[in-house]
Amino acid sequence: MAATMMSKTIISSKQCSKPIAPPKVSINKGFVNTSAAIKNREMMVWQPFNNKMFETFSYLPPLTDEQISKQVDYILANAWTPCLEFAASDQAYAGNENCITMGPVASTYQDNRYWTMWKLPMFGCTDGSQVLTEIQACTKAFPDAYIRLVCFDANRQVQISGFLVHRPPSATDYRLPADRQV
């Protein structure tokens, strides 16, 4: 088995050492070969400026109310506890400036950022409309803040998921998917 794995590794490294040929687009009986176009798209460069992401679904355009509702239904169907959190634009991203330190000791929170909780976690919530009502109330109270919905699993005692439900209108750190690569 080790010999088989070694031979596969050698073969794949030989294939990778070949120079990259320019893409070819061929038309055969009215059909266009798009594999070259796909390969070119895969080789694009990630835009590093004003292209920040948040947790789950960050690569997608902002979610609509209907899409958020479906996610909330999924959260409730799995008996997870939804919770809303919000943060100002300058405190929303992970970084040392947002990390709470006490001398040489730093917080051990997973991504060095704390968001303020909107009310309490929604224990016992059974209806997605309750969560959507709270999202609207939080958005009305803090229109220039990032608002995310996180959910917790009481059995495993961990955060299961988190995603943005509101991005401030003044945010300039987001790019549409078509503009994320150079």
From Swiss-Prot:
A Pfam family annotated for this UniProt entry = RuBisCO_small
Name of the gene:
RBCS6
- What residue ranges carry the coiled-coil annotation? none
Record's keyword annotation contains Ligase:
no
Question: What residue stretch is labeled transit peptide in the record?
Answer: 1-41
Record CDD domains: RuBisCO_small
GO annotations under biological process? photorespiration; reductive pentose-phosphate cycle
Q: Give UniProt keywords alphabetically.
A: Calvin cycle, Carbon dioxide fixation, Chloroplast, Photorespiration, Photosynthesis, Plastid, Transit peptide
Q: Does the keyword Transit peptide apply?
A: yes
Q: Name one GO molecular function term.
A: ribulose-bisphosphate carboxylase activity
Which organism encodes this protein?
A: Acetabularia peniculus (Green alga)
The molecule here is called Ribulose bisphosphate carboxylase small subunit, chloroplastic 6
Among InterPro entries, the record links this protein to:
RuBisCO_ssu (IPR024681), RuBisCO_ssu_dom (IPR000894), RuBisCO_ssu_sf (IPR036385)
